[in-house]
């Protein structure tokens, strides 16, 4: 039994939406190390389950839509099926039912390492099953085998102007990789739609494999005078190869990267990057085009650039107030920020109503590896002070820190000071989640997304007719 069925069975039995069955060993079911073979077994069962569910409940009403929802970015509107993760307002993200602490405990790790390997999370997101070490090793070697970039993409990256933002370079390079798309080629030749998922799987595996090379090349070109990224080592895991290509050899930084790439991978389906990938993919655009579009969304200040804005604000705070700051001075500074009409970056979330568990696991990493770092101390001090001020102000629905409040500080500590680049790391990680879902979207035959739009006059008439 996979998570896809086991989690729901457990929830029904125990009457809980997040049951202790998240730790059931039976979800480590498949013995094959070939991910595609495992999927080939899972997909027909899930197709049948959903077909039966739709036949029985296809006309069932699952919620109401208000005028505020329509004008408010569709917040809270139930309108997407997204299998790989669910965001609970109180508990935070669950990857196929597993919390971040559970993933840290259960997913395989590198020899001598303590953080989960992103390869293991990808296996979990795709299959719903916790992989064993052999399955994770298979993914690592498979991605190493697929990692080489075509020459035209290398030439393209080497000729970008240095004032072109790293995210623009990432998006353009991913789009150019579309020349390698198995899906686009087969679709043009009239492939049967039952084969769509297999082609999307191949493209997704290729793209994830190549992303560290693209991202490292951007970094080297912009910040390391165009020095070589070197070669992929098939004996190393995905994160280790990535940090080596970036030019970092500290194994603590590699451990941080494993954690970072794991926790930023997915955040259910309604956020801008995940929804964009789903929307563009629903037009049967190939994974390269779908993911490139997602990266353009991630580049927005309200999505992936937030961690950069946090660090800019922290640096400005340090410059204004000096080294060690008293709690009283910090409170005054925060109130001045709020009273000037600005927000405290890194606090609040559209869905979460508690401290983001992605913040918590980064805090725990810092407490273990860099407890005396001045910037970390400042972040920890803010954690004690900011929520109470936001509650006192009375405007924030969620006064607690999110993932962006911490990640930049950790990267800075290990020497990655180039803030413009941070969202590229976020993008590399996000591929694990949105491409896992893209495989399933094609496997389940999800149609072209086409919601109904209305004008303000039309809404007013509708409301008038309903209230009349």
From Swiss-Prot:
The active site is at 303, 349, 404. It catalyses: oxaloacetate + acetyl-CoA + H2O = citrate + CoA + H(+). It is found in: Mitochondrion matrix. GO terms for cellular component: mitochondrial matrix. Residues 1-30 form a transit peptide. Its EC number is 2.3.3.1. Belongs to the citrate synthase family. Citrate synthase is found in nearly all cells capable of oxidative metabolism. This is Citrate synthase, mitochondrial. It comes from Xenopus laevis (African clawed frog). The lineage of its organism: Eukaryota, Metazoa, Chordata, Craniata, Vertebrata. The gene is cs.
């Amino acid at each position: 039994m996979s998570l896809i069925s086991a989690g729901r069975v457990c929830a029904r039995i125990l009457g809980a939406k997040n049951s202790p069955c998240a730790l059931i060993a039976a979800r480590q079911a498949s013995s094959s190390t070939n991910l595609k073979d495992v999927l080939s077994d899972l997909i027909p069962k899930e197709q049948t389950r959903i077909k039966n569910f739709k036949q029985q409940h296809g006309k069932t009403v699952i919620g109401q839509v208000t005028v505020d929802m329509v004008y408010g970015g569709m917040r809270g509107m139930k309108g997407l099926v997204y299998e790989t993760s669910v965001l609970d307002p109180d508990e935070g993200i669950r990857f196929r039912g597993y919390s971040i602490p559970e993933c840290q405990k259960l997913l395989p790790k590198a020899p001598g390492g303590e953080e989960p390997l992103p390869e293991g999370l990808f296996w979990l997101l795709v299959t719903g099953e916790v992989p064993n070490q052999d399955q994770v090793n298979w993914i690592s070697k498979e991605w190493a085998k697929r990692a080489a970039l075509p020459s035209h993409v290398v030439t393209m990256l080497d000729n970008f102007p240095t004032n072109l933002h790293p995210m623009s370079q990432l998006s353009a390079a991913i789009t150019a990789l579309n020349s390698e798309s198995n899906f686009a080629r087969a679709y043009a030749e009239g492939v049967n739609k039952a084969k769509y998922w297999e082609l999307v799987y191949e493209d997704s595996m290729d793209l994830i494999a190549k992303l560290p090379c693209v991202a490292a090349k951007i970094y080297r070109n912009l910040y390391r005078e165009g020095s070589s990224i070197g070669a992929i080592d098939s004996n190393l895991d995905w994160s280790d190869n990535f940090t080596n290509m970036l030019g970092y050899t500290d194994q603590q930084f590699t451990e941080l990267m494993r954690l970072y790439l794991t926790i930023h991978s997915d955040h259910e389906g309604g956020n801008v990057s995940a929804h964009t990938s789903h929307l563009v993919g629903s037009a049967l655009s190939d994974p390269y085009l779908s993911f490139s579009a997602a990266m353009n969304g991630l580049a927005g200040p309200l999505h992936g650039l937030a961690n950069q804005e946090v660090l800019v604000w922290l640096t400005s705070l340090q410059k204004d107030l000096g080294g060690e700051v008293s709690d009283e001075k910090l409170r005054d500074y925060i109130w001045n920020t709020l009273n000037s009409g600005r927000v405290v970056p890194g606090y609040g979330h559209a869905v979460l109503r508690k401290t983001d568990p992605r913040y918590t696991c980064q805090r725990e990493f810092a407490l273990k590896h860099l407890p005396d770092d001045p910037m970390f101390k400042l972040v920890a001090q803010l954690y004690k002070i900011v929520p109470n001020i936001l509650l006192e102000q009375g405007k924030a629905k969620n006064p607690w820190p999110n993932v962006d409040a911490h990640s930049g500080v950790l990267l800075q500590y290990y020497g990655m000071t180039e803030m413009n680049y941070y969202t590229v790391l976020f993008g590399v990680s996000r591929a694990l989640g949105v491409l896992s879902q893209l495989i399933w979207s094609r496997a389940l035959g999800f149609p072209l997304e086409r919601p109904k739009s209305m004008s303000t006059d039309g809404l007013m008439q509708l409301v008038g007719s309903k209230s009349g």
